[in-house]
Amino acid sequence: MAQIAVKEKFMGTWRLLECYGSWSDGRISYPYGEDPEGQLIYDGRDNFSGQIVGSGRRPFQTGNLLKGTQEEIKAAFEGYIAYYGTYEVDESKGQVTHHVVGALFPNWIGDVQTRDFSFEGERLRLSTQPIKGSRADLINILLWERA
């Protein structure tokens, strides 16, 4: 019964408040800038959808999606991430698992991504497991607020 209650807390639409990387050597990084926007949706049928838009993205000069320069296309890709699929909640581990069906980054398709979670009132904190780096380990942290 408790798992149902926790899963129900996920359901709905969430607005991104913060997105940053915390390195084991003390550094903080902002992969989508210091003021990104984003939306995360969990429904009652185990589906999710998430998007993050980097701050400072610039429009293509031509105004045409198919006629951007290589630099414009690269910047647009690097400043945005989107993915969707199904999810499951493991309350005992404090984890939500995303089974990726589609994503802007093709390597994520078919991937399983597990995030640690905690709720603080109407806020949801998601964080990755430590990612091994050459100099330090990284944990990506996203703080969401119910929209």
Identify the residue ranges that each predicted region occupies.
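Lipid interaction determinants
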Residues: 1-147
